[in-house]
């Protein structure tokens, strides 16, 4: 580790996939709460990051407490250019920190934020309970209503850059040369050690004794513990050895977060935490650079190299976990915990945020642990007579232990469980992206999922009642597969919709088919979502060209993400994009010279009835399969 004079820490990681990774603590959207406009942090992230996708790949993220950015060159010879690109996001050509946003066209960025909101709510249920209970909203990424306050927002963006301080910045680089160290010193090293403008922290009180009913795939227990080094090390021990365990932070609060498929599992842990046996294998901190970076920026008091603590975690894990269990037990006795219950009834809510998202929050719930964990326990909710019997279970059935080696499961597109695994992957990606619990690799006939779940545990989770209901609550995930199957098979739309669990998507098999484009190039349907999808064909089309289309559409504020699948048929791609501007996205593709043939479907929301209307899709006039 190298520490610059202003407190910035630089780590060299030769095995890192990224070329440069920048983390900024105390810079997330919780700072928006006192500013009065939620989404400033996320908007700033979108404005700052800019790169040429012909030479680089890059991304950024904003959470409650931090912001992070990374960049990697597509070719090794452009490594130093990747470093310069990342630096250019924060500094001008004279190496002066960017604080002037007067010439930025904010409208496109804000509409892109609205499209991201739409994408995330269509693909997942994006609700941040902690942020809401501590003064924010259930969604804090910014909405299109920000267009009404542009002058204020420009000033807030400028002030937000002045929140930056050296002591809160961590930088990972793959290789460190004299030139790169000089670059980093002349740019990031010029940031003050302490911020020019000291931000006000939100007034946060402990959220106690609450049950939150909201759309989620599993039961989740959040127990507040002391924000200390020993507790952090104990949590890392658990994360390396168990699935569906992580931590959550907001301001200086730390929560242990554990998810379960069944209600009696969380109840057992709630009443028996002191007796839980955690088996910890060797700790190697093999969690990837994302997780390691998040440790530094979620816990800015962590000043030493986290790898210095591997010996402590391996030799003193029993002591660390005993102290953590005691802390969790005391927090339960003091009611410093929350329970998230899966609920998918839109009409069942008693609280709405400023954006009219509704959830059911039951406060002052009474939990009284008894000495005998096998005894009956009564939980009385607010104004309700409600009791549950806690079943004493063996601890091995409560926690989902990681397997020592990575498991692979290949699911054919034609398999009836394909959509279950596809949705499970999306859930893991959205909730546990940094821990890399569940990754995928496309094959010619299906998906290969890599995971560290025991097969019985994985089956229990995917076939649990809560996950099945969650899966059914997000029809938007299925639209792209239903319409893909419509284009590449001989089956009509009604058959596909009625039997969506048996959709055949074997691209290798259907590459033998020849698709004939009809005279009409546009078909309008009405569903529960807004999107544009269909087939495009052209000799000059490639995955790289379509990626360029995505970035152009994003820069115009028209979409957040564009999915594309290359078909076996020559020069033909299937595309799909959720958007709040379906007409504009359709017109964008119509105007592209590289596309010589197209058949696009434009979906608008069906406001009259709940049923989807595919009546315009007559197989004989849309396309021909030979």
Curated annotation (Swiss-Prot):
Into which EC class is this enzyme placed? hydrolase
Disulfide bond keyword on record: no
| Protein name per Swiss-Prot or TrEMBL | Probable metalloendopeptidase G1-type
- Which InterPro entries does the UniProt entry name for this protein? Metalloenz_LuxS/M16 (IPR011249), Peptidase_M44 (IPR005072)
| Alphabetic keyword roster | Hydrolase, Metal-binding, Metalloprotease, Protease, Zinc
Keyword DNA repair found: no
EC assignment: the record states: 3.4.24.-
Name one molecular function that GO assigns to this entry.
Answer: zinc ion binding
- What is one process in the GO biological process aspect for this record? viral life cycle
Specify the taxonomic lineage.
Viruses, Varidnaviria, Bamfordvirae, Nucleocytoviricota, Pokkesviricetes
**Pfam entry (one):** Peptidase_M44
Q: List the disulfide bonds.
A: none
Any idea which positions bind Zn(2+)?
Answer: 42, 46
